Curated annotation (Swiss-Prot):
The record marks 343 as: Important for beta-aspartyl-AMP intermediate formation. PANTHER family: ASPARAGINE SYNTHETASE (PTHR11772), ASPARAGINE SYNTHETASE [GLUTAMINE-HYDROLYZING] 1 (PTHR11772:SF48). Pathway: Amino-acid biosynthesis; L-asparagine biosynthesis; L-asparagine from L-aspartate (L-Gln route): step 1/1. Gene3D superfamilies: Glutamine Phosphoribosylpyrophosphate, subunit 1, domain 1, HUPs. This is Asparagine synthetase [glutamine-hydrolyzing]. NCBIfam families: PRK09431.1. It catalyses: L-aspartate + L-glutamine + ATP + H2O = L-asparagine + L-glutamate + AMP + diphosphate + H(+). InterPro entries: Asn_synth_AEB (IPR006426), Asn_synthase (IPR001962), Asn_Synthetase (IPR050795), AsnB_N (IPR033738), GATase_2_dom (IPR017932), Ntn_hydrolases_N (IPR029055), Rossmann-like_a/b/a_fold (IPR014729). L-glutamine binds at residues 50-54, 75-77, 98. Keywords: Amino-acid biosynthesis, Asparagine biosynthesis, ATP-binding, Glutamine amidotransferase, Ligase, Nucleotide-binding.
Length: 525
């Protein structure tokens, strides 16, 4: 993943302002350590920190149309860029970057081109012909994006909060599936599939159709010009990602460049459930498996860095982000720049254990809709920022736009958990990949019950975090919690500890994590 920063409609075009924009952009350098770029046009600055995955040699940003009147800075991957290029025969491309197509599509189709993109993205596009700009974020919010406003009337857009919190009067999450137009001065939703209205779907479950949709999602994400691998915890989701990747790797450009044997990566405390399960799956699939160990103290020592990079004080997110953060550093040290990961399945298929309590299919469907809509604040945040902290890109096929649309169109009766007839959580996903003749996974892995990521890496991890937090937060401090933190008041010592660290890094009163911006924290146990 790359990092983008844009300052638009800025009243100050001095050299000092340019230096300041560069300084703020460097705060995102971990996201894109391969190249830094800046375009200054009139009262607008577009900065970019590049992680080179596609066309490393010539794809530096910002990117332009032929006469450089359209300027764009992008964080993302456009998986159908080759097909889109074929539909632009009159255009000349300067690079092989998948993102350059955005500038030419806008020139040809205006803002409506966004519906043509198949991928994940956050971008800011400046049209210097009329000094207007548009900014947009992908359907689910896989790529992070924030928008802020300055006292001078400027609009600021950044991949991370740390690019905005010192210079903006107010900032918030840029909503997923939306486009912001300076001409209108407002957001409009571009992603509005049938499931988004929360109407109960009625399409019968077709195992082969669901399998095909997921395989297509994984195959798209094999688009890379750099070494890659898969994150493998040994649970259902990551194991399916690894299995499909291994099955379809041969014959791809990635295989031609880096070989047909897939690399897999797992992290855990010594003796943790994930390490054991991941090794079994890796042996079954024949991957080159890399196992990383960490201690509870290693994780505790990394907490401040995790909160700084992931930019949250949500307890569950921090617990799960820390092992991922540590693993990402190890993976990057091996020369790998991209991994494929399994986030999103639990939200789509009702995989969390509390879904056992769903009273009917209507309530289950509504809850899955709400969980998917909130993903950008939790698992997407973790998967993107815990990896990007080390210049590693994570791709998440379960959150492929087309796959989500297929999975969310299925009658939710099929997602209901019914132990009496053998339907455990995510039964339809398991059933879709239950192939007797050419198995994707061993049966006991395919039907392994879900564990929380932070439990799977080792049961003592959470206990260690709670004990460490108790050393820093007293009972007396907890009595004043509602006065010190009136918004999203921490109710446990662990939550209070994370909040103290967060406030030290991001002290601005108006941050996206305030309740007025709609955040509801996930439950932790």
């Amino acid at each position: 993943m790359c990092g983008i920063l844009a300052v638009l409609g800025c009243s100050d075009d001095s050299q000092a302002k340019r230096v300041r924009v560069l300084e703020l952009s460097r705060r995102l350098k971990h996201r894109g350590p391969d190249w830094s770029g800046l375009d200054h046009h009139g009262d607008c600055y577009l900065a970019h920190q590049r992680l080179a995955i596609i066309d490393p040699a010539s794809g530096d940003q910002p990117l332009y149309n032929e006469d450089k009147t359209i300027i764009v800075t992008v964080n993302g991957e456009i998986y159908n860029h080759e097909e889109l290029r074929k539909g632009l025969p009159g255009h000349t491309f300067r690079t092989g970057s998948d993102c350059e197509v955005i500038a030419h599509l806008y020139e040809e189709h205006g803002e409506s081109f966004i519906h043509m993109l198949d991928g994940i993205f956050s971008f800011v596009l400046l049209d210097s012909r009329n000094n207007s700009f548009v900014a947009a974020r992908d359907a689910i919010g896989v790529t992070p994006l924030y928008i802020g406003w300055g006292l001078d009337g400027s609009v600021w857009i950044s991949s991370e909060m740390k690019g905005l919190n010192d210079d903006c009067e107010h900032f918030k999450f840029f909503p997923p599936g939306h486009l912001y137009s300076s001409k209108e001065g407002s957001f409009k939703r571009w992603y509005n599939p049938p499931w988004f209205s929360e109407v109960i779907p009625s399409v019968p479950f077709d195992p082969l159709a669901l399998r095909k949709a997921f395989e297509d999602a994984v195959i798209k994400r094999l688009m890379t010009d750099v070494p890659f691998g898969v994150l493998l915890s040994g649970g259902l989701d990551s194991s399916l990602v690894a299995s499909v990747t291994a099955r379809y790797l041969e014959g791809t450009k990635a295989a031609e460049l880096w070989g047909t044997q897939l690399h897999s990566f797992c992290v855990g405390l010594e003796g943790s459930p994930d390490l054991k399960a991941a090794k079994e799956v890796a042996n079954f699939l024949g991957t080159i498996h890399h196992e990383f160990h960490f201690t509870v103290q290693d994780g505790i020592d990394a907490i401040e860095d995790v909160i700084y990079h992931v930019e949250t004080y949500d307890v569950t997110t921090i617990r799960a982000s820390t092992p991922m953060f540590l693993m990402s550093r190890k993976i990057k040290s091996l020369g790998v720049k991209m991994v494929i990961s399994g986030e999103g399945s639990d939200e789509i298929f009702g995989g969390y254990l509390y879904f056992h309590k769903a009273p009917n299919k209507e309530e289950l469907h509504l809850e899955t809709c709400h969980k998917i809509k909130a993903l950008h604040q939790y698992d997407c945040l973790r998967a993107n920022k815990a990896t990007s902290a080390w210049g590693l890109e994570a791709r998440v096929p379960f959150l492929d736009k087309e796959f989500v649309n297929v999975a969310m169109s299925i009658d939710p009766e099929w997602k209901m958990i019914k132990p009496d007839i053998g339907r455990i959580e995510k039964w339809i996903l398991r059933r879709a990949f239950d192939d007797e003749e050419n198995p994707y996974l061993p049966k006991h892995i395919l039907y392994r019950q879900k564990e929380q990521f932070s439990d799977g890496v080792g049961y003592s991890w959470i206990d260690g975090l709670k004990a460490h937090s108790a050393l820093h937060v007293t009972d007396k401090m907890m009595l004043n919690a509602a006065h010190i933190y009136p918004h999203n008041t921490p109710t446990t010592k662990e939550a209070y500890y994370y909040r103290m660290i967060f406030e030290r890094f991001f002290p601005q009163i108006d941050s996206p994590w305030r309740s007025k911006c709609g955040l509801q924290h996930s439950k932790s146990y």
